[in-house]
Amino acid sequence: MTNKKKPVIYLIGSLRNEKIPYLANDLRKLGFEVFDDWFSPGPEADEFWRKYEKIRGSTYKQALSNYAGKHIYEFDKFHINRANIGILYMPAGKSGHLELGYMIGQRKKCYVLFDKEPERWDVMYQFADAVCFNFKELKEELSKLKNDTLK
């Protein structure tokens, strides 16, 4: 019996996207380990962090260097680094796009999933291995992967 590790997906998206954990569950059913724990603080986590740091008198630059900013960043980065695959679930903000770009720069398999055609188009999503517009398309792309091709 072989003990192959499951490929790891880092699911990227917005804290405000209530569909994140459901997509994560669907991906788990396909046999992947999916990291979406970043979603657990809730939709206002960034705003609460900002308010807290403002009360302390911190600038944005200082807040990035304080314990909360550093620990949250290191937590996410650790899991991004251990993942083989990145999936950006749209709509997503600046952080999500930075995370996807970082993963693409590491030559990991990366995908963008839209739930509908966007109003504003952008050619740069072509950096991803595929741009999908529904779960079926994403599932087809993921089925093409072989464990030996994942970094």
Model-based region annotation:
Residues 1-151:
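Conserved catalytic or regulatory cores that recognize and/or transform ribose-phosphate-containing ligands
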